[in-house]
């Protein structure tokens, strides 16, 4: 038994001395791949949502008057674009952070906490942006008869359709961050349990 342990320790020392990083365990590898995939998807959905919204401008003639529909006329749509931009930027930074964390052989509780906090803030921001844009989009498409607000999508169909696509893409980015927050919470809980066990030993 002592010989086996010594051999294992020597082998590990030789691997580290040659500069190789030990191959991560299966759960850690799955967690890393899920983090990378969901962050890349969140970036892609956020960029696509911004593109759909900023290119949704439409000029139409209504009752003989030249009318323009632009996302910048709505504070809710501007907020959604801003939220997508912030989430996209921080997703790139967090992707780099996750890749750097994966190079360490041991989980660090403090860094897992920061990752969880980041993902939760991004999720809340996307919830705010999607909720605001959905409310305005609903009124624009269906109107509000009780207060005599008329639906405008019958006149500016292109604008409304692209705004709808943008909102759907933003929701997909939101779902990515719901998954990331869940993963980060699970990882944080696991790291806390591991740290507590080591402290009691």
UniProtKB/Swiss-Prot annotation:
Q: Does the keyword Transmembrane apply?
A: yes
GO CC list = plasma membrane
Which UniProt key words apply to this protein?
Answer: Cell membrane, Membrane, Transmembrane, Transmembrane helix
Q: Which residues lie on this side of the membrane: Extracellular?
A: 51-78, 141-162
Q: Enumerate the Cytoplasmic topological stretches.
A: 1-29, 100-119, 184-201
Q: Does Cell membrane appear among the keywords?
A: yes
Where, per UniProt, does this protein localize? Cell membrane
> Where primarily located?
membrane
Annotated Pfam families: CASP_dom
Membrane topology of the entry: Multi-pass membrane protein
What transmembrane ranges does the database entry give?
Answer: 30-50, 79-99, 120-140, 163-183
Record-stated family: Belongs to the Casparian strip membrane proteins (CASP) family.
Give the PANTHER family listed for this entry.
CASP-LIKE PROTEIN 1U1 (PTHR36488:SF8)
Quaternary form? Homodimer and heterodimers.
Descriptive protein name = CASP-like protein 1F2
